[in-house]
Structure formats: C-alpha cells, structure tokens
Amino acid sequence: NQCRTEVTDDDSIGCATCHNAETMQLQLYSEPLKDYLKSVGKDPAKLPRSEMRSLVCAQCHVEYYFNDPGHGPTKRPVFPWKNGFTPEAIYSVYEDNGNVDMPGFKGKFADWVHPVSQTPMLKMQHPDYETWIDGPHGAAGVACADCHMPYQREEGKKMSSHWWTSPLRDPELRACRQCHADKTAAYLRGRIEYTQDKTYKQLLVAQEYSVRAHEAVRLALEYTGEKPADYDQLIILAKEAVRKGQMFWDFVSAENSVGFHNPAKALDTLTSSITLSQDAINAALKATNYGIAPKLEGDIKQIVPPILKMSRKLQQDPEYLKTHPWFAYLKPLPKADQMWEGNKKIQ
C-alpha cells in the first residue's frame, strides 16, 4: 500500500503502470516494449506470469532512444534490442537510425555532441533489464520481483512487497535467503559487496581512460604542427573509439546494481571500454605524429581536474564557466526559473 500513500500528482508511476485496473493482474502499458515483444513473435497479452514479473519492470528500467530527433510529445521511444541485449548489439543499432551530419558519422544516432572532443555521443539510460537478462539470476529464471518485491504476509495474506529497493536494505536479506537458505545474511552481503566493489573500482579506471581519450581528441583537433596524410581518417577513428568507449562505460555506470545483476558482463564491458578509450588515444597520437604526447603524460586528474559541481543553473553563470578548462567549450545558458527539484515539480 506504499504506492497509494506515496505517489504524488507529479509521479507518473502508479498501480496501472503494472496492473490491470479491473482484475489487478499484471499487464504491460509500454507501447515500445509491446512493439519489441511482437517483433520476436510474442503476444504481450498472453505471457506467463513468471515472465511478466520481470517485463513490468522492463517497461522503464531499460535503455531506449527516440525515433525522431525532435523528441516531441508525438515521438515515441524505441528499445534498441533487435540485435540482442549486449552493449555491442545495442551499439550496432545506433550505427544508423540517426541524423548526425558529420564526416565519418553521417546517419548515425547521437544524443549530443561532446563540446570538448566534438564527438557524437550516446547516453545510456538505465539498462537494468539488459544487464540482468543474461546474468546468473536472469539466466536461471529468477525474476526482478523475486528479489526486489519478495513475498510477505499481511494479516494472513500473501502478497508482494511494494517497497521497491535494494535487498541490501533488509538487514536479514530475506529476499536472497528465499533461495540461498543455507547462507547467512552476513555471507550473502559480503559476496554482493565484493562484486560491487570490484565493479566500481574498474568503473573508475574506465572513467579515467575515457576522460583522457576526450582530452587526446581535443588536443589533436587543435594541433597546429605537422600532420600525417591520413590525419582526417585518424581523427574519425579516434572519435569513434571515444564514442563507443564511453557508451560501454556508461552501460555499467547508468545501470543500478553496480555489476551485481551480471558481474561477468559488467567487468567485460568495462574492459572493452578501457581498450576502446586507449584505441582513441593511440589514434589521436598518430594523428599528430605524437606531438601531443607530452601533454597527455601523468595523472589525468591533474591534466583534467574532476568536475565535481555542475548544473544547469551553474551553466547560466559566465563567471563559473571560467573555473575549469573544459568549461571554455560550453556556451552560457540563458537565465531561466527552476521548474523541478529532483522528481518534484516546484513551479
């Protein structure tokens, strides 16, 4: 009953998001998800409950893109799953289905152009479903709801908890111990945190490689020394690797389990991200006959200090944009009133 008391007028998630209003049976309202299911020969109205206990979550906890760059109210999101659920398969969808008009990227999809490296970029949303589906639990048929909405009893009735949160919030880890009954809560918590710690540390490594790659491309674009005959092609290769490397990093960063939904996939994706970012650096170095190499030596946090504070409001302040070397590539935004605070509308 938490939903009935905590959902505000501005919150778009309610009972009807997952339940038929008359029967309270699970049902899908997401047209993009239904489109995908139909494309693989499944009837959204005739799926088993075991599958529905994850698909209702996949209505939102997924990666998606809009099928029109206008992103207007008549446009609709598309789930990029036609080639599979891996980062590589999703990336292949973004190799077309867009309107980028830049040498080497014509017709590709991009969410924005990075102001520093001038690279058409991809922003992952929250690919929880795509990460979980071929992980240990997903492959074993464990549904999202089994862990995040475990059964409980209220007044003698069995029902699913609607406190949507991490199972780690429960000191007893009862959701986990429904299956892992032979393990203590302390042991299970330790295994989860071990995976998350390894993933997070690798995420930070991949992040630094990505920043260095953007900086390498920036330096190569502004390089005025002697350049090789294939300079333009090397710049395209560098940008392509920056774009893909950051997307792979973001696939793990934007996902909510810090690797736990699929430890092998998370670490493999981050390894690929690091390799791609290094490929970008190598291409940028070649494009300048290694003339920029001295400027890329050392701790990347010293070369490009971490941006610890940034917001739309701060970008409206020209003086603040003087506080970081990368901010020089941003245009000050026009003054505007703040409309939202988190998920609460304030005006």
Question: What are the language-model segments listed below?
Answer:
Residues Q2-D146, P150-A336:
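Primarily the internal scaffold of c-type cytochrome electron-transfer domains
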Residues Q338-Q347:
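Extended, compositionally biased alpha-helical segments that mediate assembly or anchoring
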